[in-house]
Amino acid sequence: MEVILRKTNLNDLYVSASGRLDLDNAVEYGTKIKDFIEDSDDVITNVTLDFAEITFISSFGLKVILELYKQLKEQQGTIKLKNVSEQAMSSFKMVGFDKFLLFE
């Protein structure tokens, strides 16, 4: 899985990836994001996850998103998901993530 991370503003991170966010890829995806946030000279408080090319999300992927949400919430930050497919959105809704995550 290729994960592209780029700062769009001082405190904003934009993440795009392609493929399946499952057991094989979720840990790598989450680790790359967390490492980028921790290694940044600036405090990253807003993260946008672009799901345009994510074809599937498993419970492992959902766990990574939840951990990222909790990390950002501690810093009064936000996480926003955009271009989420209907299949992925049904997974988010099934576990109640649509109640606290921002979707665009």
Predicted features and spans:
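Short beta-strand/loop segment at the start of cytosolic alpha/beta domains
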Residues: 1-16
